[in-house]
Amino acid sequence: MEKSDQSKIAIVTGGASGIGLAIAEKFVKNNITTIVIGRNEEKLKSAKTKLGALCETIAFDLNDLSAIPELIKKLVEKYSRIDILVNNAGINLKKEFTEVTDEDFEKIIHTNVQSIFTISREVVKNMIVNKSGSIVNISSMASQYGLPKVIAYSASKGAIEAMTRAMAVELSPKGIRVNCIAPGFIATDMSAKALNNEPERKNKVLSRTPMGELGAPSTIGDAAMFLAGSEAAYITGVVLPVDGGNSIG
C-alpha cells in the first residue's frame, strides 16, 4: 500500500521552468516535498520563490554522470527516502538530418537518455529498500510521429518510452511503478513565443490538434501528479499521451 501522497519526497529534474516547473508546482500544492534539479541558477532562484518552503532547488548538471550517485546519496541522507522521481530534463536540437553531426546526436542521447538511466538507477536503489516508489518519465509525441528536423530528439524520446516499459516490468515486483507522459504541443513560455513568431506554423500545429489549442503546462503537472500518486497505484508501464488528441491519428 502506498503512503499518503502528502508525506512523500519527490525529485523533479529540469524543474526550474516550463513543464518541469508546472509539475513541481502541482506536487507542492499537494504538500509533497519537492527537490527541483536544474542548471540555470537564476531560474532555480525564481522557482524557489514561487514554490516556497516545500521546495529545495539544486544547481546540478545531469551530464556529470559520475557525480549523480553522490548527489542522490546526500539527498537520501537528508530526507531518508525518495518516493517520486520525475525525469523531465532534456534538450532539443532542430537541424536538417544531413546537418546533424555525430557530436550533436551523442549530446542529445547523453542528456536525454543516459542521464535518465543513471539518476533512475541511483534513486531506485533507495526505492527498493523502501519497497515502494514511482518514476514518471517525460517523452514527447515526437517519439511516435515523424516530425522533421528533430531526428536525435525523436530517437531519444523513443528510447525513454522503451526504458519505461522495461523498467516497469523489472521493478514492479519490488513495489516500484514506472510510467511515462508523452506531451503534445504545450504552451510553455519558450514554445508559445516561438509559435507566435511563426503564424503559419502555429496554424498548422493547431489544425492537426483535434482540440484546436495548445496545452497548458499545468495539464502535464496534473498528469504527473496522477501517475506519481496513490490514485494510479495499479498503473505501470503506461505511456500517457497528453496531446489534445494528436495521438488519435
Map each language-model feature to its residues.
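Residue(s) in the substrate-gating loop at a strand-loop-helix junction
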Residues: S140
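C-terminal helical subdomain
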Residues: C180, N203-E231, I235, G244
